[in-house]
Amino acid sequence: MNGGKKIGTISTDNSTGKMSSPPKPTTIPHIVKEEVIASGKWLKLEKTTYVDPVGNTRTWETTKRTTRQANAADGVGIIALLKRTLHKDCVVMVKQFRPPMGCCTLEFPAGLIDEGESAEIAALRELKEETGYKGEVVGVTPVTCLDPGLSNCTTQIVMVNINGDDLENTNPTQQLGDGEFVEVLLLPLDEFQREIDDLMKKEKIVVDSKVYIYGMGMSQAFFKPNELRVLKQ
């Protein structure tokens, strides 16, 4: 529950044994006002006043980035596939310590979109900085939300192919900024979820939900649904 938000449920009428439904919508939900509670260099906390589907006025605590550019997503996530002769295709991943989590996380390379950048340009720049690899964009998703119950942060997922036989990619060099400590991991595409699960058993690490969902999708692509490891747990 957040800032007075009520969770809608379907309950049972004990007298009749029939299911009762939530109230029917009577209006279109909309924002009334947004007030800044606190603001830092990168983030701000706001109190959002809104009207719910049945006309009640409520409040919500919302976090927002201070760096958002007009008409653009906040950042990009990069699914980069490294292709090399006589090697399995590998997904390029990054491992780094995240202070909010208090431990290391396994993520796709990612970063904020700078002013004037497209998602494609931002993705290639961030990939080069974080991993040292030079790639080619092969696909871009629409703008998607990250954690809509907490913030208005958005991202675009950019698919990139990396020619591992290219001389520039045989010995990639990261271009990290001050305070950035990023370890690059190459996980075979056909063993992606297994590699993630093994890593979680060996280390104190949290996997980004987007990464794990991608792993489940790859498992479904390579194996029958009833053989998914996650379904056997």
Predicted regions and their residues:
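Short amphipathic beta-strand and strand-loop transition segments with alternating hydrophobic
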Residues: 29-37
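Nudix hydrolase/Nudix homology domain
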Residues: 4-25, 29, 103-104, 115, ...
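Short, well-ordered strand-loop elements centered on a beta-strand within folded domains, enriched
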Residues: 30-31, 56-62, 86-95
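Residues in well-ordered beta-strands of folded domains
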Residues: 49, 63, 79, 109, ...
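Active-site segment of metal-dependent pyrophosphate-handling enzymes
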Residues: 44, 81, 96-100, 105-107, ...
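Acidic, metal-coordinating catalytic segment for phosphate/diphosphate chemistry
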Residues: 37-79
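Conserved Nudix-box catalytic region and its N-terminal flanking loop in Nudix hydrolases
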Residues: 10, 68-82, 86-125, 142-145, ...
